[in-house]
């Protein structure tokens, strides 16, 4: 590594000779970082808060703050990704991320006691989940909008020792002095037990008369496991904790090798190659290769198989896949402002279109002249869907859930 007069790192070279460089402003803020052909440029305000990040010249993320230095919005290429609102004690009381708004209510100890979401009926904000806490800050009760209640009990170390679901069924838990879970008893009295060694590694798991065992080396790497059915598997590792050998119950052994950055170079007879950004470039097996190409944002752009078949991909600046092309067959995707698929086309002809509710659930899907309409309850559980063609109902399905 190389440093400037202020002892700030300005150049680093990793084990494979890939080079990173760094630049700083007079306040010590990192203003530029390069790694091989990738570049990130940062801009700060007078309070040294990051206000703009430009990646590879095209991907621009901007950040806004309130007078107290709290982040209130984040935009990517002028599209708002996240916005936040706070109360007087800096609790986030509202967060909107990709169009979905969630509001939070807190108690005097800053525990979130209510989670509010847009109602699927009228769009108004409703408390979908409410939470109660004990004096130690453990969540002891969850209650949803339909009055379904989950209750929890804890020991002195805040380990959950019992959970009662909305139907009254109880699951119980026990722990050792190091807070490792040693026993789980289901509502049907089924019991799972766990034992640990002095390093908190699981060495035995038992259920009724069946038992699985585990052994470890001095570095706490798992080296042997015997399943409940007597199947044995063993493992070996290098000095970096990377698995170098795996032996199956039938005696078959698979060996592994790695490069200086810890990336897998081989797995049995399979071979792998990577670029500087850890993207898989090539996978070889039995003298056949699959090759991969990427754009400057590490999105895969082409796959070429051993028979010279090519699949090409395109992406927008937000990381959404916009096109897949295979031979003369092209599938195109468009997205709404919240990065959800809006339309799908095949060879230029619209194939499917989607609409969404205020929660981001798929509300309808139109494909090949058939429309599927979906309904959900306030817990985002699907309650029904109907397939129609014109004015004719083709099929209808409804769902019911425990506790309703």
Predicted feature descriptions by range:
Residues 1-14, 18-55, 59-144, 148-165, ...:
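Beta-strand elements of repeat-based all-beta scaffolds
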